[in-house]
Amino acid sequence: MKNIFFIVSFLLIFSCNNPAHFSKSDRPNIILINVDDLGWKDLGFMGSQYYETPFLDEFAKQGMVFTNAYASAANCAPSRASLFSGLNTPRHGVYTVGSSKRGDKRTRKLVPAKNKKYLNDSIYTLPEMLKSAGYVTANFGKWHIGKDPKTQGIDHNIGGSNKGNPGKDGYFSPYKIDFIKNEKPGEYLTDRLTNETITFIKKNIASPFFANLSFYSVHTPIQGKKSWIKNYASKNGV
């Protein structure tokens, strides 16, 4: 049994280091959509009568919904660090955003743990693994687990850095985040990231690709397009 396990392990490792071993059909394109601070009850298919999420509702209808799933951490960077490393928080050391001494010490129930702001360079990330298998990798939007996604396995990056939010009035161009060029004044960041992702997909449709679309919204500061603000302001409960 040990010999069989060793052979299987060796074949898996060997295969990952030889992308030519796989055909295109063996390497499906991957689009990972990550929405920051979205409540599970804020989706139409989960019962929301206030927020309108028709496209996500259609995704849920055509795909699979996990109703007993949990994030590996309660806030931004730790959850992302676990997602892209496959490690629990004690293993990668990113316990919170900034200092673990944040907040009022009188309400603290634990002794603050030593905290790392970003993933250590020695940690093998999901994008690095996919690159070794022949994927073209891209990040659009929030990264928050390192200063530059290109040092952690990303080939193309738009708007991703160590910043956790776009800053005051930062959802509209001119932007205050890194690695993004300002184009049309007043452009909405969520729309820009979506359009950049679509362009990348069309350009790389013939190659296996990994696209991490990580919107800064609905993370604070809450800044919506005027047309949508008007739509929601007319609803009951505002």
Where are these regions (language model features)?
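Formylglycine-dependent sulfatase
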Residues: K2, C16-V238
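Sec-dependent N-terminal signal peptides
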Residues: I4-I13
